[in-house]
């Protein structure tokens, strides 16, 4: 059952990542904003769910596997983030690379903290 939870969650997470990314890239084609939004919202969600599912509602392990390991594992894109960051550097877009790399990390840390805080309020 645990394997199925991770499989289903990962598939749905990957699909949502793809849909969000192509939607955002239509509006901001020259900056990897889609990946940045996905990684930062994923950071928020993992912070929120890590508290909410364990301390607020005490969700069963298979639900935690479905949402955190599965969905968020498929949804977040750290490997894509690093590849796109290197691509910006290789193209000589150093300022964009700086904003992208630093912005994703700073916002990611802040969103994990915010998610944990809000998850604890419920």
UniProtKB/Swiss-Prot annotation:
Predominant subcellular localization, coarse grouping: membrane
Its GO CC terms are: plasma membrane
Activity control? Na(+) is not transported, but it plays an essential structural role and its presence is essential for fluoride channel function.
Name of this protein: Fluoride-specific ion channel FluC
Family, according to the entry, reads as follows: Belongs to the fluoride channel Fluc/FEX (TC 1.A.43) family.
Q: Which GO terms describe its molecular function?
A: fluoride channel activity; metal ion binding
Q: Does the keyword Transmembrane apply?
A: yes
Subcellular location, record wording: Cell inner membrane
Enumerate the UniProt keywords alphabetically.
Cell inner membrane, Cell membrane, Ion channel, Ion transport, Membrane, Metal-binding, Sodium, Transmembrane, Transmembrane helix, Transport
Q: Which residues bind Na(+)?
A: 73, 76
**What InterPro entries does the entry give?**
FluC
Instruction: Name the GO terms of the biological process aspect.
Output: cellular detoxification of fluoride
**Membrane disposition:** Multi-pass membrane protein
In Pfam terms, one family for this protein is CRCB
Reaction catalysed?
A: fluoride(in) = fluoride(out)
Fetch the PANTHER family from UniProt: FLUORIDE EXPORT PROTEIN 1-RELATED, FLUORIDE-SPECIFIC ION CHANNEL FLUC
So where does this one cross the membrane? 4-24, 33-53, 66-86, 95-115
Functionally, this protein is described as follows:
Fluoride-specific ion channel. Important for reducing fluoride concentration in the cell, thus reducing its toxicity.
């Amino acid at each position: 059952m645990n394997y199925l939870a991770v499989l289903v969650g990962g598939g749905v997470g990957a699909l949502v990542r793809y849909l969000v990314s192509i939607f955002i890239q239509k509006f901001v084609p020259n900056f990897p904003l889609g990946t940045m939004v996905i990684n930062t919202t994923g950071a928020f969600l993992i912070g929120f769910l890590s508290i909410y599912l364990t301390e607020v509602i005490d969700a069963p392990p298979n639900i935690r596997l479905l949402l955190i390991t599965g969905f968020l594992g498929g949804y977040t894109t750290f490997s894509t983030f690093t590849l796109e960051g290197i691509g910006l550097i290789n193209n000589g877009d150093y300022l964009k690379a700086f904003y992208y790399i630093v912005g994703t990390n700073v916002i990611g840390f802040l969103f994990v903290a915010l998610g944990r805080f809000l998850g604890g309020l419920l």
